[in-house]
Swiss-Prot record:
<dbReference type="InterPro" id="IPR004516">
    <property type="entry name" value="HisRS/HisZ"/>
</dbReference>
<comment type="pathway">
    <text>Amino-acid biosynthesis; L-histidine biosynthesis; L-histidine from 5-phospho-alpha-D-ribose 1-diphosphate: step 1/9.</text>
</comment>
<dbReference type="InterPro" id="IPR045864">
    <property type="entry name" value="aa-tRNA-synth_II/BPL/LPL"/>
</dbReference>
<dbReference type="GO" id="GO:0005737">
    <property type="term" value="C:cytoplasm"/>
</dbReference>
<dbReference type="GO" id="GO:0000105">
    <property type="term" value="P:L-histidine biosynthetic process"/>
</dbReference>
<keyword id="KW-0963">Cytoplasm</keyword>
<keyword id="KW-0368">Histidine biosynthesis</keyword>
<comment type="similarity">
    <text>Belongs to the class-II aminoacyl-tRNA synthetase family. HisZ subfamily.</text>
</comment>
<dbReference type="InterPro" id="IPR041715">
    <property type="entry name" value="HisRS-like_core"/>
</dbReference>
<dbReference type="InterPro" id="IPR004517">
    <property type="entry name" value="HisZ"/>
</dbReference>
<dbReference type="Pfam" id="PF13393">
    <property type="entry name" value="tRNA-synt_His"/>
</dbReference>
<comment type="function">
    <text>Required for the first step of histidine biosynthesis. May allow the feedback regulation of ATP phosphoribosyltransferase activity by histidine.</text>
</comment>
<dbReference type="InterPro" id="IPR006195">
    <property type="entry name" value="aa-tRNA-synth_II"/>
</dbReference>
<dbReference type="GO" id="GO:0006427">
    <property type="term" value="P:histidyl-tRNA aminoacylation"/>
</dbReference>
<protein>
    <recommendedName>
        <fullName>ATP phosphoribosyltransferase regulatory subunit</fullName>
    </recommendedName>
</protein>
<dbReference type="GO" id="GO:0004821">
    <property type="term" value="F:histidine-tRNA ligase activity"/>
</dbReference>
<comment type="subunit">
    <text>Heteromultimer composed of HisG and HisZ subunits.</text>
</comment>
């Protein structure tokens, strides 16, 4: 697809956005790099094209649209709820395909009816694809990071391990490596004797003072590196994590959860059965999941094409709940993907918490599917 031209179905796509009351928004191609480096996820970070301004500020070519759309919303102090639509180029280093390609999508900001907004995102993504690819049967894979977080929390793991596991959600290779480390801990070795003694004593102030003294003696600047307090707390956390072992029963509970893969119509019962058998209370996460399934049915979405996979996530760190991807049945090419990102706008500087959900289309892949028809 020549990048100097829009896809031939672009006008039809924009009409679909208009019909869904989504306002077209443009964002600069050159973006501040920091938000992407901080919260976009490791998979995207290593694909970003970096540059810098004359003053040395880190910049990048726009690698995706969600963060730029949210930044523009905050800058313009626009009220919510608000639906934005976008269509434009993004720039990523890719093993296959062009490094610059078109994406389009909708970001739905500020709707406090979470189940309804989630259902609308999935319904819009599948509905638009059905118009662009008539006669194709679509397949939707759905996951929920909030349910995974509830399972990890209910197992009573130390907070540091919870954060690590949640951060790895959706990356089974990384998740399996972390679980292996929990089953067979690798104890921290090579600690300075004085530091090991101070950590064992629990005297944080003495540990901080010792680290500060060592930094001064070796010429480390606290302005150019972590502070003594940060170093002390990271060392303590590392030691605690290295000494934490996941017992066999808890390990098998996590394995059982991650193996769940059922049609969405059966997912609520499967999750309830899992929680009862494991003796876990999943509380609000399960209630929200069930509410979303009900909202999808109420919105007329064809539930027969939706599967729930407990281990499914997307490689962007800002997702907080629903995640989903859409393919043509029998194909592995992801045509649309999205999810819920309720913490993102606050992280980017919004004064109030703004619930948000959205999705994006991969237009080059849609064009390939249309050409194959």
């Amino acid at each position: 697809m020549p990048l100097i031209n829009l896809p031939e179905f672009a006008t039809e796509l924009l009409s679909e956005f208009d019909a869904r009351n989504a306002e077209r928004i443009d964002t600069p191609v050159i973006q501040p790099a920091e938000p992407f480096l901080d919260i976009a996820g490791e998979d995207l970070r290593r694909r970003i094209f970096m540059t810098e301004s004359e003053t040395g500020a880190s910049l990048c070519l726009r690698p995706e649209f969600t963060i730029p759309v949210c930044l523009r919303h905050i800058e313009t102090a626009t009220g919510t709820p608000k639906r934005y639509a976008y269509l434009g180029e993004v720039f990523r280093q890719r093993r296959d395909g062009a490094n610059e390609f078109y994406q389009a999508g909708i970001e739905d900001l500020g709707d406090i009816n979470i189940p309804s907004a989630d259902a609308r995102a999935i319904g819009d993504a599948t509905g638009i694809l059905a118009r662009l690819l008539p006669g194709r049967r679509l397949s939707v894979t759905l996951g929920d990071q909030a349910v995974f977080e509830a399972v990890v929390q209910a197992l009573g793991l130390p907070l540091g391990w919870q954060k690590r596991l949640i951060h790895a959600f959706g990356n089974m290779t990384q998740l399996e490596a972390l679980l292996a480390g929990l089953v067979s801990p690798q104890f921290v070795t090579g600690l300075d004797d004085d530091i090991a003694r101070l950590i064992a004593s629990g005297d944080e102030q003495a540990l901080i003072a010792h680290i500060e003294q060592e930094m001064q003696a070796t010429g480390y600047s606290t302005n150019a590196s972590r502070s003594p307090l940060e170093i002390a707390r990271r060392l303590k956390e590392k030691l605690i994590l290295s000494e934490t072992r996941l017992d066999d029963a808890a390990f098998h509970v996590l394995e059982e959860f991650l193996s769940l893969h059922v049609p969405l119509v059966n997912a609520s019962a499967a999750l309830a059965g899992f929680a009862d058998a494991a003796g876990l209370k999943l509380g609000n996460a399960l209630s929200r999941f069930n509410g979303r399934v009900g909202a999808l049915a109420d919105a007329g979405v064809d539930l027969s094409c939706l599967d729930y996979r407990a281990a499914f996530g997307r490689p962007l760190d800002y997702y907080t709940g629903l995640v989903f991807e859409v393919t043509v049945e029998g194909s592995s090419a992801v045509l649309a993907g999205g999810g819920r990102f309720d913490r993102l706008l606050t992280f980017l500087g919004a004064m109030d918490r703004i619930p948000a959900v959205g999705f994006s289309f991969w237009l080059d892949r849609i064009e390939t599917e249309r050409a194959a028809a």
